A protein has these predicted regions:
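Walker B catalytic acidic pair
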Residues: 103, 111-114, 149
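Residue-level signature of catalytic and energy-coupling elements of molecular machines
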Residues: 11, 35, 78, 110, ...
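Conserved interdomain hinge at the start of the Helicase C-terminal
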Residues: 236-252
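Alpha-helical elements of the RecA-like P-loop NTPase motor core of helicases
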Residues: 9, 98, 155, 166, ...
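Core RecA-like ATPase module of SF1/SF2 helicases and allied nucleic-acid translocases
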Residues: 254-304
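A basic/glycine-biased coupling hinge at the interface between accessory DNA-binding modules
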Residues: 1-106, 133-142, 160-162, 182, ...
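Conserved RecA-like helicase ATPase core segment
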Residues: 117-231, 243
Length: 304
């Protein structure tokens, strides 16, 4: 079983040695990512080659082909193959497909908005067996139930496609009752956020044309008003946040720092925030990760 490091090393060897290409021009990390995305979209190297309209895309298709051959020679798979190969098997072998179709009669999928095309194909093949889902009629002793929110799709960089959720009812329309309300259940009560936060979120997301319409309603009171802060750069942003924390604490002799939390989108954003907190001598804890200067790659860079 090839992990991410093994796969990356193999792609690098294919680019620099087998194909005799400059890895600075043809970045192995980028090409490995494109191969992974192709697998998550249920695409073969031939599929990529047919779609290629420039030399770089053709190079990716060729690297994908050689990568697959190398894995096969080593009697190995990567993580993406654990989904892709079962899909190919179920597509090609009616007996196997029929067996697993009969084995699983009730399918439940959580976080359906983050499903990729390969996962979607696997679900379809197991659910409908040898019949196209749109033509499958035998739902008396079978069911498929999915849970998701198209407004919360965050894994598009891994080839997840929220449109799969939006198209669910059309894909499995023969399973839907005449009373469509019984087949689509909207969970619109929100127990986490105040109504001011939800009102702002609703006003933004309603501009998205590709979604299942819903309006979140808070069970909590309105809460504090939202504040929009505009800053020139990340340094001034970090300073503004730190100053706000200090002012809210009223510069107490014994401030209670645990009442504050800073949320940020990516790990790289933590550095300037941490530096500002350190400068103001504000203690902090990073949840779900290490402090910026405690990360191995940062330690290595500083030591160098």
């Amino acid at each position: 079983m090839y992990d991410e490091t093994d796969s990356q090393t193999l792609v690098k060897e294919i680019i620099s040695q087998d194909m005799n290409l400059d890895p600075k021009r043809y970045d192995p990390k980028k090409i490995k990512r494109l191969i992974s995305n192709a697998k998550n979209q249920c695409l073969t190297s031939n599929d990529l080659l047919e779609k290629a309209d420039n030399n770089f895309d053709k190079t990716v298709a060729e690297a994908y082909k050689r990568y697959r051959i190398s894995l096969s020679k080593n009697n190995s798979l990567d993580f993406d193959d654990l989904l892709l190969l079962p899909v190919f098997l179920l597509r090609q072998n009616d007996i196997v497909r029929d067996y697993w179709h009969k084995r699983f009669k009730h399918i439940l999928v959580d976080e359906y908005q983050d499903t990729n095309r390969t996962q979607y194909e696997l679900i379809k093949l197991i659910t409908a067996g040898n019949t196209e889902p749109t033509k499958f009629l035998n739902w008396q002793d079978r069911s498929i139930f999915v849970v998701g929110d198209a407004d919360q799709s965050i894994y598009s960089f891994r080839a997840a496609d929220f449109r799969i959720l939006i198209g669910f009812q059309e894909d499995f329309k023969t399973s839907i009752n005449d009373d469509t309300k019984s087949s689509l259940i909207k969970l619109e009560e929100n127990y986490r956020s105040s109504s001011n936060i939800l009102d702002a979120a609703n006003s933004l997301i309603e501009n998205n044309s590709e979604r299942i319409d819903k309006v979140l309603k808070a069970t909590k009171e309105k809460g504090e008003l939202l504040t929009l802060l505009s800053c020139d750069d990340e340094i001034s942003e970090a300073e503004a946040i730190t100053n706000k924390i200090k002012s809210l604490n009223n510069y107490n002799q014994n401030p209670i720092w645990k009442n504050f939390a800073i949320l940020y989108r990516t790990r790289a954003q933590s550095r300037v925030l941490e530096e500002s907190l350190v400068r103001w001598r504000i203690p902090y804890t990073i949840f779900g990760g290490l402090r910026f200067y405690d990360r191995r790659e940062i330690k290595d860079a500083i030591a160098y």
